[in-house]
Amino acid sequence: MILGVDVGGTFTDLFAWDGERIQTAKLPTTPDQSKAVLDGASELADKVDFFVHGTTAATNALLERTGAHTLLVTSPGFEDVIEIGRQDRPSLYDPSDERPEPLVQRTDRVSDPSSVDPGNYESVAISLLGSYHDPSGEHLFRAAINEASPATAVSVSSEMVAEFREFERTSTTVLNAYLTPVVADYLARLEAGVRSVGLADAVSVMRSSGGLID
């Protein structure tokens, strides 16, 4: 039995196929999205061999600005790069241009991680100049943060997108750090629920770029 589940902000859609028969279900999405998934799955099957899941949990958290409280650690003088952006933006000289607020507030951007307590944050983004070529500085900072606050999630730019151009690398790393705790918490609840009722041994998740991750 194959079960496919797509969770949106309004409805949760399920598709089950046993090799001969197709079954579908549609339920309102619940505040804890895993509940609607489990309720719908119980209508279609007791046990599945392959559980495929797609969700807008990350998209919703970004649009609603409900992601993790995030700290940005970057090189001295580059704390504002995520706010300044690049000079090729369409309205470079428009003083009335309105842009979204950065995901990390100015007071939460530092060049020295020892100056703050990482335990006060759910997640940390580390993006240093030149780390696409030499990531050792980012690795040292991550080790220090992991030692000081093991429960805090850490994203490093050299692993997110190992390319030059500090704005793109930093903004991508910040986005990953901002959303990781939200998605990780949701998937942990979902997998625990799936296993507790014996529905499946694991959940495979659709990537926005295509393919699956386990």
Where are the predicted features?
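N-terminally biased helix-coil "hinge/interface" segments that flank
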Residues: 1-214
